[in-house]
């Protein structure tokens, strides 16, 4: 079953320097997932200043360039995983949060886990 995990964090954390330990631990996590077949794709996202939002409201399509001042939390990274169950997906989400806890003092955020339709 495939799931998308989305690491959500405050925009200021996205704009600050990520400690090297996070990259090292994420690299090990990614390598393990590639070897055991659970990791499909993994990536980090740039701050919202490098993005845009395209929306549809009241019959009109509008594009707004970042940064997104009204957003409290933004997705800073993601992983697509292929696991046997929702419980296994949650366990991998816990591991992603543990990487941040162990390597980024003061970091706060969440890992949203959503099953991919049709998987």
PLM features: what roles do these ranges have?
Residues 1-119:
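Conserved, structured core segments of small domains
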